[in-house]
Amino acid sequence: MPDHANDGYSVNACIVRRFEEGDAKRWDAFVAATPQATFFHLAAWRSIIEGLHHRCHYLYAERQGVVTGILPLAEIHSWLFGHALISTPFCVYGGVVAADPESEACLVQAAAALADELRVDYLELRNREPRQTDWPIKHLYVTFRKSLPSEGIDDLKAIPMKRRNKIRKGINASLETRHDGSVAEFYRVYTESVRNLGTPVLPRRWFERLRRAFGTDCEITMITLQGRPLATVMSFYFRDEVHTYYAGSVRSGRTVAANDFMYWAVMQRALERGVRLFDFGRSKQDTGSYDFKEQWGFQPEPLPYAYHLVRAKEVPNVSPTNRKYHLFIEGWKRLPLPVSRALGPFLARNLG
């Protein structure tokens, strides 16, 4: 998609345009009016991603001046995963959202043309539902989503027995919950948690920008014991959904089941806010987090991420289970926390 196409170009009677600063309200109005759009399609993600020095290529389709489809895209240069055009990096969902098949087709065509022009290794569309069935599909991830019952959360009756017993352990330990945590509190716990998993952490300013951009729809829950933080989660609220997105805990929290207690607390909080759908987030198959979410009574739903290969010869294997990343992950787990906090942001900003 050439740079001079800012004024728009026609594909199959649609006009595809590049997002400009004045388009945010139109873009978000389309998101609000389109059921298949997700929290990660909101326009605010563009400036947040650009805050990590990535170039965004947000596209939208219109017909007779009316927005009929959107496609958020960002270009990532990763020392691990190569040069990619992704919808949407740092987000679990993305891809085209369109009012009609023609608008979807012209946005996909425009994205593929842009990927070819940029000479990326590949274009990745993080679809939540099957799309682009003629493209290579990778089912590395699943998501876990479920409607919360109107009764049985507070008294644990709606919680599966194994998780219920864990929550009672937290209750008996007198764990406390706050839903007004600060980014500073969150970051101290979260950085330790992801270091223990062997993952570089995003910079603190990333989470600060999320809070500023989404306000009360971005909430930090803190679980403490006698004032000492044990677990935390940054959740996103969108329509009638809550996404528990960035979560972590310290090792000492395991003895009192702080993680289980925390997710139970967020379920209670969601119902207080009138939200009924709980999004537990994505997990890789055959992992501990996958099993954990199933034990809460959630069923896995495959995430059919679609790929258009440009310079790459095959769909990339970006799974941490890839032997190629094993030494890095194991080494990162052993880093002193101050070192992982200092180095992590320089690496994580390019992982996407």
PLM feature segments, named:
Residues 54-56, 117-120, 273-275:
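Short, high-confidence coil segments that cap the C-terminus of an alpha-helix
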Residues 60-68, 75, 80, 91, ...:
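Aromatic (often tryptophan-rich) hydrophobic motifs at membrane interfaces
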Residues 87-95, 139-146:
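Acyl/amide activation-and-transfer machinery of modular secondary-metabolite enzymes
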Residues 102-145:
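Non-catalytic accessory segments adjacent to catalytic cores
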Residues 2-11, 75, 129-154, 276, ...:
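Active-site/acyl-donor-binding loops of N-acyltransferases
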Residues 12-64, 71-81, 127-255:
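A conserved beta-strand-loop-helix scaffold within acyl/acetyltransferase catalytic domains
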Residues 88, 157-166, 319-326:
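Short intrinsically disordered coil segments
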